[in-house]
Amino acid sequence: MSIQSIVTKETLKKKDTNIEIQEKNMNDLVVSASRVIAPLWPISTFAAHHPWMGLEKQSFEQVANWLKEARNVDIYPSASMIHSAKAKGEIEESFLQIALSRWLDSQSFHMPRETAERFCQEALKLERLPSSLLSSPELNKLAEEISYVNTGSMKDSSMQPISSLIENQKGDNLSDILNYHIIKWCKLYLDDTGASWTMPNREKGFYRAWQHLITFDPALSKNERKVLKDWPEDPLIALTKALSELGISESNMQAYLEGHLLSLPGWAGMIRWRSQQSIEEQELLVEYLAVRLSMELAIVKPYLPLKNQKAEKKVSIVPLIASWIYWGDISVEKWSQMSATEQSELLAFAYRFDENTRKKLWLKAWEQTHAEQLREKIASKQRATNDKKRVVAQLAFCIDVRSEPFRRHLEKLGPFETFGIAGFFGLPIATTELGSNNSHPSLPVILKPKHQIKELTDENEYNSYEQRKKIDSSVSYTFKTMKQNVLTSMLLPEVSGPLLGLQMVTRSFVPRSVGGFIRNLRKTMLQKPNTTFSLNHVHDTNCEIPIGFTKEEKVNYVRQALKMVGLTEGFAPLVVMCGHSSQSTNNPYAAALECGACGGAAGGFNARVFATLCNLPEVREALSAEGINIPEDTIFAAAEHKTTVDELEWIYVPKLSETAQEAFDCIDSIMPNVSQHANRERLMQLPNFKTKIKNPSKEAHRFAEDWSEIRPEWGLARNASFIIGQRELTRDCDLEGRAFLHNYDWKQDESGDILASIIAGPGTVAQWINLQYYASTVAPHYYGSGNKTTQTVTAGLGVMQGNASDLLSGLPWQSVMQSDSETYHSPLRLLIVIQAPTKYIERLLNNDFTFREKVQNGWVRLASVDPEGRWKNW
């Protein structure tokens, strides 16, 4: 026996240490790789997120180029979108020329400037190079002749999964086969529908549950199962072993893991979200990658080692030469007569002025045009006047873009003042509605709840309500149980067919009547008794967070919200806190239409809690001591803005003072007219309507009740700006429902803390919403979720196309497209406009590194309006 084969305690200890170091490094690699995917919340909450939130340390341009190279995904607007926008006057040619001139100034080249400009001007027409030119023998012969030209800087450095490079004998790409298997195992493990038969050993974690079953999988060949039979039981060791046997070098491991995460970004995103929810599943992403790469090894092993696997991929010079022939008027003959240096410079210039660069300049021009049009709109409405009309009521709405038209019509038709604030009203709460055993974090998903608020009522009333709820839920519970049971599911069509058939016919042909009848019936049956809230602080050991608020917390949250919108004096007799909700039927994306600031739920609960706090005598006394005097006859109430039908539903109206009652009656009398105007404006934007609508409110209700309606409302489509300032800045401006509006008075914010909190909270949520719509528009096949009519809701988590696709993470086609060829949403990065002195913006950028990084790297745009009305782009 040789000395090398003797394993001593020392070598064992050293080996164990190496394994620990290796495992730690692998964990770090997975964490670093995970930045390329965004956490995906279940569709029941549909929290707004943008897919590049982990990549904001890179510039938007860098991420766009990387995605094009790594996944062939374009995240700039397409040529057709750009041409359409230009035809509609959304892009000024002058801004494109400015962008081009600046780009040329930033480049180093030795050719005449006129030659470069002429080439760029032609290339910016975004015409495709003719296929006849690209395939011409003369061009390809020329490319071979000048292949000696130095193109060292032009390399394709992307790292693709090995399975994507191999096809089996049937011509199927092995990555598609791998994805099929991974989707199957993810659905089994993540299923949240409470299926009768769940994945065995699920409680042991994804990897170990998979390992117990994989050797019995009939979809794998005998040899594939053999590879996995004696596979390591530890997911980290399995992942390390798979990478080693696949021949992935240590320097390429992170890029390789990123490639696998990007192969199914939806399922990987859901796995990542789950890993953040509990300690038990914090290693879930490691387990997912261990399963995926272990299966990849089993599938590709017969084909290993690959020829040219490590060969450096070079960029083809054929399209680069063709671009100069087509756009630069340089013929094949002229190319042949050039020196190698001249040829190399032309190739390098064409490589730099690629499709992404051209689209980047168009996007900048589009965004600059939008900013200029918004500046002109705001400037035209600014008035130097002090004659304020008498206000009988003040209404605070969510910053949601759908609030803007409603607020505009409300102010126009009555003596009202409106405010904009994030729809959770600054309350970091988890809400538990009456009769519910589950709480919902009713705040932006970037925050964690600090208080539990329960809805309460008298015991007798509660028992009666619970009994009615059980009767209502028994039918759906029975139906669900039968559907998920192996035997009863076969009887279900026979039992339920006649009733469901009748429902289908009536819902399809008379949706408004039937939907209204069912809704009113359930509303009557499930009418809540009068309820209160657990507002007072209680320490409950059974709850992770305390129930209710202390007196100091009550005062703090009210003070904070009132100061945030600048409402610290001049209170009207009636102040209404308006949450918002949506109303639609048969819509898996219902949560996407709810309040994003409330975690994908209706905002009425938060509005009611906040209004109740504002009416508490102890809160008012404490605020008065600080100089915020709320008059005794000023009453706070709560309502919910139904965005699908543009109605205001009262949800909390305490005893009103005489003046508050007058204001309440005034709102009620004017509201039908407001709804008609807001609905008419909104419905005319839908593709179904091109003529005048006789009864907009009636039509809006039909859309809400029709279960075949794929587009009950546009949601937040066309959002483009987030305006932080006093209402006077935008009052009477028709912002077309494209602006998030947040009240802010810089005079009450000497420290800048209020502005900083608006940017960190609502500003971030608005940016996520904006980039989610952006991504779903520019890359619907990758970041969208396809057509609603062909989707399948799966595992209680989200939607798929068919039964074996990625878990679709973005918005459906109907949320962003006007037609098959025309977009409705304009893919522009969010423009944040702040009304404040220049020094406030400078301080914000100096203190908030994260926000400064977003602005510098092109993830948001920033402008300001100073006290004199001067606009500045940052």
From Swiss-Prot:
Domain of life of the native organism: Bacteria
For membrane topology, the record states:
Peripheral membrane protein
Query: In Gene Ontology terms, what is one molecular function of this protein?
Result: zinc ion binding
Instruction: State the coiled-coil residue ranges.
Output: none
Q: Which UniProt keywords apply?
A: Cell membrane, Membrane, Metal-binding, Transport, Zinc
Per the record, its GO cellular-component terms are:
plasma membrane
Position of the signal peptide: none
What is the annotated localization of this protein?
Cell membrane
Residues reported to bind Zn(2+):
398, 400, 580, 595
This protein's cofactor list reads: Zn(2+)
Q: Which Pfam families match?
A: DabA
Family statement: Belongs to the inorganic carbon transporter (TC 9.A.2) DabA family.
- Family annotation (PANTHER family): INORGANIC CARBON TRANSPORTER SUBUNIT DABA-RELATED, UPF0753 PROTEIN AQ_863
Q: What does this protein do?
A: Part of an energy-coupled inorganic carbon pump.
Summarize the subunit comment: Forms a complex with DabB.
Q: What is this protein called?
A: Probable inorganic carbon transporter subunit DabA
The protein's organism comes out as Bacillus cereus (strain ZK / E33L)
- Supply the source organism's classification: Bacteria, Bacillati, Bacillota, Bacilli, Bacillales
